[in-house]
Amino acid sequence: MSTTASTSSNNLTFTSIVKSFFESYSKTPQKLKIIDLFLIYTFITGVIVFTYCCLVGTYPFNSFLAAFISTVGCFVLTVCLRIQINPINNFGKTISIERAFTDYLLCNLILHLVVFNFLG
């Protein structure tokens, strides 16, 4: 009987954690929520590319690597943008949103030039 009580206690703890997460996430600015949606999209694209590689094969291996590097690189750069824009993550350095977004665009341009060059 004690395992049932501890299991229900764990469920209450899990539900309280999930509820707390959604309550705190509802206070997140709209800009960060849009970035989060793009991160989810990029992650799903990377999973699709990797699944395609596993199921179908990697005949044009450079194309697979270019697509996968593009999704991973774009994901990492977007996470960096989210960290820079988030007002909670102010570590004493004040970077304007415009500067962070410009850095993001330039890094994405360099990333995709490298990916395009890698296609051959």
Curated annotation (Swiss-Prot):
The gene coding this protein: ost2
Protein name per Swiss-Prot or TrEMBL: Dolichyl-diphosphooligosaccharide--protein glycosyltransferase subunit 2
Oligomeric form and interacting partners: Component of the oligosaccharyltransferase (OST) complex.
Species: Dictyostelium discoideum
Role this protein plays: Subunit of the oligosaccharyl transferase (OST) complex that catalyzes the initial transfer of a defined glycan (Glc(3)Man(9)GlcNAc(2) in eukaryotes) from the lipid carrier dolichol-pyrophosphate to an asparagine residue within an Asn-X-Ser/Thr consensus motif in nascent polypeptide chains, the first step in protein N-glycosylation. N-glycosylation occurs cotranslationally and the complex associates with the Sec61 complex at the channel-forming translocon complex that mediates protein translocation across the endoplasmic reticulum (ER). All subunits are required for a maximal enzyme activity.
Transmembrane segment boundaries: 37-57, 61-81, 100-120
The keyword Transmembrane helix is assigned to this record: yes
Keywords, ordered alphabetically: Endoplasmic reticulum, Membrane, Transmembrane, Transmembrane helix
Family (UniProt): Belongs to the DAD/OST2 family.
UniProt topological domain (Cytoplasmic) ranges: 1-36, 82-99
Pathway(s) the chain acts in: Protein modification; protein glycosylation
GO cellular component: oligosaccharyltransferase complex
GO BP, one annotated term: protein N-linked glycosylation
Lumenal-side segments: 58-60
Subcellular location(s) of the protein: Endoplasmic reticulum membrane
Topology term for the membrane: Multi-pass membrane protein
